[in-house]
Amino acid sequence: MKKQRIVVKIGSSSLADSHEGISKEQLSDHVAALARLKEEGHEVLLITSGAVAAGFSALGYPSRPVTIKGKQAAAAVGQSLLMQAYTEEFRKYGIVTAQLLLTRSDFSRKEQYSNAYATLGELLNRSALPIINENDSISLEELTFGDNDMLSALVSGLVSADMLMIFTDVNGLYDKNPQKNEDAKKYYFLPEVTEEIASLAGDAGSKLGTGGMKSKVDAAKTALSLGVSVFIGTGRGQEKFVDVLKGKGDGTYVGNAPQKEMKMNKQWIALHSVVSGQIEIDAGAATAIIQHGKSLLPAGVTNVSGFFQVGEVVEVMTQQGRVIGKGQCTYSAEELRDVKGMQSQHIQARGERHSYEVIHRDHWVSL
């Protein structure tokens, strides 16, 4: 089997008992299967939930807390317990683990995003197995972030994974709730995530997690847009992850032919960057960018909104108000207002710049 880079996401519902916290039996089962993937020569990253589930009983809560402060306190205790449990299990297979705790800001800030990329790459080069969780003891986002489902999709794109496996307590996607409807139809394969499929996914998750099928479907859609195929399902035993790669997984495969892989810088622009302003362009410039893959030049700019600096991300819109994309601007707002509508040779005559693109095509993402 060809060596692949695999991201496996394991949710709280696949790790924990509703009253006793983390199940050692379930965790051991997952680790044995992850070790088999490594044994087959694949690179593996683990996105794990379970910090809150691991910590609530140690703090005396009878069940998973419902308040933000309770969840964050449980996560602060549980993260170390969870990591200790993983480390001890992986040590049995001679696998070195590494812990990374991420927040949304680690993705929105370009330098931190690049650092995460470099760190994960080095860990994989050294044959370590990164274990990633949201830093939910300080992050509000995790509480509504879908039990790390979207985090797993974003990490999959960041490391250019071949596949994202989202493991849960339900064996795939159905057209209705299989626990309440005996005639529920299972989807074994979906070429894409359509609006119809998205609408079928419910909002509610299990008592242990914050997820649910909606967050998993949303994550699958994002992963596909970044060039990563997805599996959503369940399984037991040492071969369960290897079986997924062989097409024998107990769940739903999504996107046999995902979109073209998106480079790291464009991922950051598309999904994580903060928009600092807007640029309005004429029809000719829009055609050149969208249909012919050209860079945006000052001549095509008709209006500038906001106060942005060089290198910040701006939205680009047509004169009819339709946003067509965004990118990193090589001019400040003040500079661009001064040269908008001007031909490059006229700017060159000023002798002020060596480059005239407003947004280079390598730093542009169509929406």
Curated annotation (Swiss-Prot):
- Write down the PROSITE patterns for this protein, in alphabetical order: GLUTAMATE_5_KINASE, PUA
- Principal EC category: transferase
* Catalytic activities: L-glutamate + ATP = L-glutamyl 5-phosphate + ADP
Query: Any idea where the PUA domain is?
Result: 276-350
The cellular location(s) given in this protein's UniProt record come to: Cytoplasm
Which Pfam families does the entry mention?
AA_kinase, PUA
Q: What is its main location?
A: cytoplasm
Q: Has the keyword Transferase been applied to this entry?
A: yes
Q: Which residues does the annotation say bind ATP?
A: 9, 168-169, 210-216
Gene Ontology molecular function, alphabetical: ATP binding; glutamate 5-kinase activity; RNA binding
The Gene Ontology CC terms held by the record are: cytosol
Q: In which pathway does it act?
A: Amino-acid biosynthesis; L-proline biosynthesis; L-glutamate 5-semialdehyde from L-glutamate: step 1/2
Query: What keywords sit in the KW lines?
Result: Amino-acid biosynthesis, ATP-binding, Cytoplasm, Kinase, Nucleotide-binding, Proline biosynthesis, Transferase
Residue ranges the record marks as coiled coil: none
Q: What does this protein do?
A: Catalyzes the transfer of a phosphate group to glutamate to form L-glutamate 5-phosphate.
- Describe the family membership recorded for this protein in Swiss-Prot or TrEMBL: Belongs to the glutamate 5-kinase family.
Protein name, entry field? Glutamate 5-kinase
